[in-house]
Amino acid sequence: LGHTGGTLDKLETIPGWRASLSNDEFYAQLRSVGAVICAAGSGLAPADGRLYSLRDITGTVESIPLIASSIMSKKIAEGTAALVLDVKFGSGAFMQDPARSRELAETMVRIGKDAGVKTVALLTNMNVPLGLAIGNANEVRESVEVLSGGGPADVIELTLALAREMLALAGQPDADVEAHLAGGKAMDTWRAMISAQGGDPDAALPAPRESQQVVADRDGVLVAQHALPFGIAAWRLGAGRARKEDPVVHAAGIDLAVKPGAAVKK
């Protein structure tokens, strides 16, 4: 996924956690825990892999109808009854142009509804990095911080917005998502999900062998913080891959100290 990173790469920084589940394991965990994050099995939407290979050699990787069908074919094949999509735009997103991101979101919502799946999409801005962490272990660490009741305000805001949409589609529009987050229920589910997939939720995440601090060269206010250069820098450090078979350095990444609008000192 280049500079955008992959969800499974991030979760695989957790010692013991496994992404591959059989169908029986998937449904058993969904019933017992209520949450699963796993890799799509090869038999889920087998035509998608072949179509992607064709897109790669025909210059149609950025075709919105083909992107939408690739994403939605897997979601529909899962037997999903309701689906919430987080469609990002901006310099740090796969689809940078807001108009094209909106077109992609509308296309996927239409496909979902045509297939009988209750589908909504949120358009979210990735011109500025989300949160303060960039990289695999870094972002997992920040996610755990949010589940513990802390973390950056923008990550909390997006998390709550997505949760509200999910619960509304599930017939629970009045559920108090803030209370579940603050009261520890969300963290309990996270720990149960990680444990069910072989991971240790208490294990230390990979730490870098060395680090370098970048400081302000003058006093002032940070007025801009473009996501793309940070993503590329983390990718070059090893947090992403250029080819599917490339290894990922789990501890590689960047931790930001401030967001735009913050005062900095030399």
Residue ranges and their predicted role:
Residues 9, 28, 73, 110, ...:
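Surface-exposed charge patches
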Residues 60-63, 67, 77, 81-266:
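Well-ordered secondary-structure scaffolds
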